[in-house]
């Protein structure tokens, strides 16, 4: 998400673009051997190593949402997977048949590029389910990332109550030629990040002036046709949100110094996933940034337009 984080859950528009690396899913159906019908799910890292390997008896029973704060990572992942699998329509899993489902990431799982959202989009497509409903029942959140994974193009995303809406949107690659994404290696949990500021978001929702201000800034970013205008809008969005939610900007967290013409903005949940920076900022904080992995925005973000 380029702009709109957190506030998208209370009705403010958000702007998001897909990245090139994704996640694929293969499904094999075969006659069950002795011992009953089974479903085996194996999820693989970018390097091919398995990070999740679970086996379930069929048919599945519904499972309540996992409490991520009170479960081990493995227990949580198993419960989340079981819950998603249980959402299929009655009779979807054929009697006398077993299944093997294998997923493969094309990016590092710790990068925050969408391992969960691409999994939901892939499985919903396979099972004939509404991906937004699957997302809400399993993970919660706004669902913008699932919409991006489904559409495969940039979009403007907003919610009317619980209903997700989106339109196509693109951003000129000329405007982003000097942008870089900094991977911080501290993947954030979006559900927990939203939970931490839930009460403040509710207060923002009831502040008409603030909501109008956020919508206007997001609209300015959406329509920007000059680099300085676009970057100023992103910096303004971050400053308003930091003040409203009591969160630290990357300048505060990393003790970075603002520089004229520089851009440094959180991408994803604040505090660890990624930073968006431009060349001006990269030059001014070269020493501090050298320990992080960086890629050019235009090398990883897809479906942009060129003037």
Regions of interest found by a model, annotated:
Residues 16, 24, 146, 156, ...:
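Conserved hydrophobic/aromatic beta-strand scaffold that supports enzyme active sites
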Residues 3-5, 9-11, 216-307:
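Glycine-rich, charge-dense phosphate/pyrophosphate-binding loop(s)
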Residues 75-168, 289:
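Gly/Ser-rich oxyanion-binding loop with an adjacent helix/lid
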Residues 7-12, 16-18, 117-118, 142-153, ...:
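FAD-binding core of FAD-dependent oxidoreductases
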Residues 51-60, 77, 105, 118-124, ...:
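Long, contiguous secondary-structure blocks with strong helical propensity
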Residues 1-111, 133, 263-271, 280-286, ...:
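ATP-binding N-lobe of GHMP and related small-molecule kinases
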Residues 169-223:
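Acyltransferase
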């Amino acid at each position: 998400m380029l702009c709109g984080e957190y506030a998208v859950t209370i009705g403010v528009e958000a702007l998001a673009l897909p990245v090139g690396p994704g996640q694929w899913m293969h499904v094999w159906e075969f006659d069950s051997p002795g011992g009953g019908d089974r479903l085996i799910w194996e999820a693989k890292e970018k390097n091919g190593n398995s990070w999740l390997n679970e086996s379930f008896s069929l048919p599945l029973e519904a499972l309540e949402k996992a409490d991520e704060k009170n479960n081990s990572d493995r227990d949580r992942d198993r419960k989340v997977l079981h819950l998603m699998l249980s959402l299929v329509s009655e009779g979807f899993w054929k009697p006398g048949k077993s299944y093997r489902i294998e997923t493969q990431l094309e990016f590092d799982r710790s990068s925050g590029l969408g391992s969960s959202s691409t999994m939901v989009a892939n499985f919903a497509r396979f099972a004939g389910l509404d991906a937004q409903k699957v997302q809400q029942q399993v993970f919660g959140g706004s669902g913008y990332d699932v919409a991006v994974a489904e559409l495969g193009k940039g979009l403007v995303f907003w919610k009317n109550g619980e209903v997700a809406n989106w339109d196509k949107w693109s951003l000129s690659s000329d405007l982003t030629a000097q942008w870089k994404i900094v991977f911080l290696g501290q993947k954030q949990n979006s559900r927990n990040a939203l939970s931490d500021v839930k009460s403040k978001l509710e207060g923002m929702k009831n502040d008409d002036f603030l909501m109008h201000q956020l919508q206007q800034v997001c609209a300015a970013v959406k329509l920007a046709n000059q680099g300085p205008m676009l970057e100023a809008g992103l910096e303004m969005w971050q400053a308003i949100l930091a003040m409203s939610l009591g969160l630290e900007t990357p300048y505060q967290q990393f003790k970075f110094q603002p520089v004229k013409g520089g851009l440094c903005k959180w991408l994803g949940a604040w505090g660890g996933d990624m930073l968006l920076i431009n060349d001006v900022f990269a030059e001014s904080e070269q020493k501090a940034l050298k320990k992080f992995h960086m890629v050019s925005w235009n090398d990883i973000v897809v479906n942009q337009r060129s003037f």
